[in-house]
A protein has these predicted regions:
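Secretory targeting signals
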Residues: 48-81, 88, 117-178
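Hydrophobic alpha-helical transmembrane segments
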Residues: 1-86, 93, 243-259, 267-282, ...
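Helix-loop-helix units of permease transmembrane domains in multi-pass membrane transporters
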Residues: 85-123
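Transmembrane alpha-helical segments
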Residues: 82, 162-166, 170, 238-250
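Alpha-helical transmembrane segments and their short interhelical loops
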Residues: 124-173, 345, 409-498, 503
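Aromatic-anchored segments of alpha-helical transmembrane domains
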Residues: 45-52, 129-134, 185-196, 266-276
Length: 527
């Protein structure tokens, strides 16, 4: 009997750590080869492949915002797949009715659970390479702006590891393969609910959700981004560690190492989560300066007779601005006035979020301060441009601002209304500048009602042209550009006179115009 029991006594001495690592390697291969893992990776990269094949890649990506987009797809696509696959792998013995066989193996249940927790880590490392390759490819584009935050990039594999650990924990809590997909669905619903609440101004929810979105609907220079990325990474990593320790505890792991690990990851999650709420006064002051007096934070470049001033992150966009501005100028005769200048503008501080609004007095004060600062910096009557570029409507809005400056010699004020022949001429100048501005003009016209609106969402600055006045300009785009351009040059002074009616523009161009509305229904022009 003693001879029979001796081998079992030796078996107990088999090093569990080595056995656990061997099992983790096998499970890592199974994890990577699982069909759901492959489908998740294909879904993750499919938008990149589509952009490459169709040529629709964003030519002006803001890199630090693109990383946040990757976090979102990494959370729901790669992370969701990891949750389900990790859960299925941890439940394999139960699903195959082989639970009893594990009782005769030398590796205890907590160590097997640790192997399942380690198995997704090589996959997470591969996710890191995928995300870095995507951001690297975008950074090579000539129009790339901003710079990626390494902590935000590192968050993507941590999110995958967090959800994979959640899948293992669910397998130890409920022995059913249905639970993981249901949990992922519930998580998606909860995440959407939290996102809506955060968009309404709940800063706590914005910081405590796995993916930390910005609270502004447009890009900021990287130095002004209010996202505590490193602290948020520590917070999510702490959550992942806490879930992993919970899975080990549920598997029967006890003792001082488990207790110490639980305390440490809890402290990391709590400390990093709380640290996210620390406000940075220097960042707030920089945002105020960027809003009211951006010249001190910008670099200016002279291209021909035009000065272009932009935040350092966005200087790569200057050639795009120049192409649109020169497209507008091509149809304009030489005019006198201050030297042309383009200056980037961003509403980095005080932007209304969470349902709040900005009063007209506040907007007037902010715009007055900005115009005075621009003039003090040597760029009077500057043409403003925002931090959104590359889409057709943004280029059309900038073309409208440039056309207004060339017609009037002054920068437009917020909510300017351009009427009469000026309005028709402005619309034509926008449409003929570049193919992108022509497409943007059509989109803006389709979305407008009562007046054609050129509004920059990043600054709330814009102008509107009443539909009756805009219609002749749109119709003139159907005529040969050279013929219309010659007429514009010959009658420039008349067409840019605020007293000239749109009927005169229509008569000169030979295009129709709608009958004048009754006087009580006419739009009152303010510019």
């Amino acid at each position: 009997m003693t001879a029979v029991l001796a081998p079992a006594e030796d078996a107990v001495r088999v090093p569990w750590r080595r056995a656990m690592l061997a099992l983790a390697r096998i499970e890592a291969v199974r994890f990577a080869r699982h069909p759901l893992t492959l489908v998740a990776v294909l879904l993750f990269v499919s938008p990149w492949v589509y952009d490459l094949v169709t040529g629709s890649t964003d030519r002006y990506p803001v890199l630090h915002d693109k990383v946040v987009g990757l976090q979102l797809s990494g959370l729901f696509i790669l992370g969701g797949g990891a949750l389900v696959v990790a859960n299925l792998n941890a439940l394999r013995a139960h699903r195959h009715r082989t639970d009893a066989l594990y009782s005769v193996l030398v590796l205890p249940d907590p160590w097997r659970t640790a192997a399942f927790l380690l198995a997704p880590l090589p996959y997470a490392a591969g996710v890191t390479l995928l995300a870095a390759a995507r951001i690297g490819a975008l950074a090579l584009l000539p129009g790339a702006a901003g710079r990626p935050d390494p902590a935000e990039l590192a968050l993507i594999p941590v999110l995958v590891a967090l959800l994979a650990a959640t899948g293992v924990l669910l397998a130890r809590l409920v022995r059913s393969a249905v639970v993981a997909p249901l949990a992922m669905f519930a998580f998606a619903v909860a995440a959407f609910t939290v996102l809506v609440a955060a968009a309404r101004g709940n800063a706590a929810l914005r910081l405590l959700q796995p993916v930390m979105f910005g609270d502004l609907p447009f890009a900021l220079p990287a130095d002004l981004v209010d996202r505590p990325s490193l602290r948020h990474l520590g917070y999510v990593a702490g959550l992942a560690g806490l879930v992993a320790v919970a899975a080990l505890f549920r598997s029967g792991a006890r003792g001082r190492p488990v207790t110490v690990a639980a305390v440490l990851v809890s402290l990391v999650a709590a400390a990093a989560g709380a640290a996210q709420f620390h406000t940075d006064d220097a960042l707030r002051r920089a945002a105020v300066t960027a809003t009211d007096n951006p010249a001190v934070q910008q670099a200016c470049h002279r291209r021909g007779d035009v000065t272009y001033c932009a935040f350092a992150d966005f200087t790569a966009w200057i050639p795009g601005w120049e192409a649109v501005l020169q497209g507008v100028r091509r149809a304009v005769p030489a005019v006198t006035g201050p030297p042309l200048a383009v200056r980037q503008r961003v509403w980095a501080h005080g932007y209304p979020t969470g349902g709040s609004t900005s009063s007209s007095a506040d907007e007037t004060g902010r715009n007055t301060a900005w115009e005075r600062a621009a003039e003090a910096a040597g760029t009077p009557a500057v043409i403003p441009v925002g931090t959104r570029w590359g889409d057709d409507t943004s280029e059309a809005v900038f073309a409208a601002a440039a056309a207004h400056r060339l017609m009037t010699g002054s920068a437009f004020t917020p909510s300017s209304m351009v009427c009469g022949a000026r309005g028709a001429l402005l619309v034509w100048l926008v449409g003929q500048a570049t193919p992108a501005t022509a497409r943007g003009l059509r989109k803006l016209d389709a979305a407008s009602s009562g007046a054609l609106a050129f509004v920059d969402d990043t600054t709330f600055m814009g102008m509107v042209v009443p539909d009756r006045d805009a219609a002749p300009g749109l119709s003139a785009l159907g005529r040969p550009p050279a013929e219309v351009g010659a007429l514009v040059t010959a009658h420039w002074t008349e067409l840019t006179d605020p007293a000239t009616a749109a009927d005169r523009f229509a008569a000169l161009m030979g295009v129709p115009i709608a009958p004048e509305q009754p006087e009580e229904e006419r739009t009152v022009c303010t510019a």
